[in-house]
Amino acid sequence: MREETPEQPAPLRSGYTTGSCATATSLAAARLLLGGTISDAVQIVLPKGQQVLMRLEFCRAWENGAEAGTLKDAGDDPDVTHGALVFARVRLSAEPGVRFHAGPGVGTVTRPGLTLAVGEPAINPVPRQMIERHLAQLAAERGYAGGFEVAIGVEGGAELALKTMNPRLGILGGLSILGTSGIVRPFSCSAYIASIHQGIDVARANGVRHIAACTGNASEDAMRRRYALPEIALIEMGDFAGAVLKHLRRAPVEKLSLCGGFGKISKLAGGHLDLHSRHSSIDLPQLAGWAAALGASTALQDSMRAANTSQQALAQAHAEGVALGDAVCAHALRFARGIVPTEVALEVFAIDRQGNLVGQACEERR
């Protein structure tokens, strides 16, 4: 039998970012090179001052340097890198400072628009700062005046990266080493939202003036059929419509097309920025009210309120010639317009489960 769910569920467990893993392994390897001993754990300080002890899978001599590895623990967050082996390979160099390299499974930046220059390893700024700070402190403690060559790798990272937005962002060959706080908050989805922002920034930096933000593969396909947009212009927003709309305040484009399943667009029309079922639900009475404004009969309104799904309510409305899909898109456009700068032309499209267009609303610009 299935076990009953406890009335008071246990609190979700936080984890550590790939940036924290890279810092811990870099420090352990560098310490070994500067006369330290092989250890099975290392303590690091996170950006906000928390001290954490991270377990090592190995710490050993490697070629003319040293390497250390740790398993990424994302806590209870559904992170693609959870359980992956993150490792650092460190060599000493005569020149002071730290020079970063992409080890196996870590990507390289190939397009402008990110916080890293083209050609740089995809080790983000905060993880770089963490590693630099820890290695500088170690060098001072050991009286070492030279520098470090640091290569960060992730076992299986090239394959894992295909499940992320890295290929579309132009980060090729592997994963990015991420993190701003050093801690992964369960279901905070901060990495996903950051990748949405990066996608917009990369599109802008590469001269793209029209982007299409889509909730999934079917809506992306619909936008491909409608427009000859390059892949870089397709932004996989998932449930995070707010991440797109708010980012355009500081990083506007000429035109934004929003496309998603009818249910998702219905939530946006109802004033929700997070379209996931955990945070928003479809308001069937609201849909019935919009249908009423289009002349829907009382019987139709009642059947829509009793519908099992938004798709069923849509089918009922369309069967009576009520253009509910267009109305929902118009309400979604009106809500989005209140967030997005007026310089950005807006349009909204809704599709059914087969990917067919069932509604649209486009602004007329003079």
Curated annotation (Swiss-Prot):
Chemical reaction(s) catalysed: Co-precorrin-5B + S-adenosyl-L-methionine = Co-precorrin-6A + S-adenosyl-L-homocysteine
InterPro entries: CbiD, CbiD_sf
Pathway stated in the Swiss-Prot or TrEMBL entry: Cofactor biosynthesis; adenosylcobalamin biosynthesis; cob(II)yrinate a,c-diamide from sirohydrochlorin (anaerobic route): step 6/10
Any single GO BP term: anaerobic cobalamin biosynthetic process
Keyword vocabulary terms for this entry: Cobalamin biosynthesis, Methyltransferase, S-adenosyl-L-methionine, Transferase
GO MF annotation list: cobalt-precorrin-5B C1-methyltransferase activity
Domain of life: Bacteria
EC number, as in UniProt: 2.1.1.195
One Pfam short name: CbiD
Family the UniProt entry places it in: Belongs to the CbiD family.
Name this polypeptide is given: Cobalt-precorrin-5B C(1)-methyltransferase
Organism annotation: Pseudomonas aeruginosa (strain ATCC 15692 / DSM 22644 / CIP 104116 / JCM 14847 / LMG 12228 / 1C / PRS 101 / PAO1)
Phylogenetic classification of the source organism: Bacteria, Pseudomonadati, Pseudomonadota, Gammaproteobacteria, Pseudomonadales
